[in-house]
């Protein structure tokens, strides 16, 4: 069951490994990221899902992606759900305080259907 406040939203999965890994030069990475961020900023009823969120601040070009997302996240133009392991969160995400403060940490033991609904309800006030 989808909460009423989320019924008009689309969820898009972004594959960071493909986005960053297929580029040849740093400038090419930045161009792809800039294009994606501009596209996401125009889609106000879209939530992006990024698995392996730690890659935003860990891989070549990743820091550029994290920095480019920050303004859109602050203004509410970009809405994001990220997933990573506790170890990777502590090793990478916690080091970037400016990126970290734009998120609410939710620990999930196993993502069954009732848990997913609870997570979405927990993020609902931030999306309204």
PLM segments and residue spans:
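A short beta-strand-to-loop transition that corresponds to the Sensor-1 phosphate-sensing loop
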Residues: 50-53, 82-88, 111-112
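Short regulatory helix/loop adjacent to the ATP-binding pocket of P-loop NTPases
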Residues: 2, 61-63, 87-102, 120
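Conserved AAA+ ATPase "sensor/coupling" helix adjacent to the nucleotide-binding pocket
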Residues: 118-128
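Short glycine-rich substrate-engagement loop in P-loop NTPases that contacts/grips substrate
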Residues: 10-41
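Walker A/P-loop
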Residues: 1-7
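Conserved ATPase-coupling elements of RecA-like P-loop NTPase cores
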Residues: 22-29, 43, 55-66, 91-94
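Loop/turn-to-beta-strand initiation segments
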Residues: 9-11, 41-48, 75-82, 104
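A short helix-turn-beta junction within AAA+ P-loop NTPase domains corresponding to the substrate/partner-engaging
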Residues: 70-74, 93-109
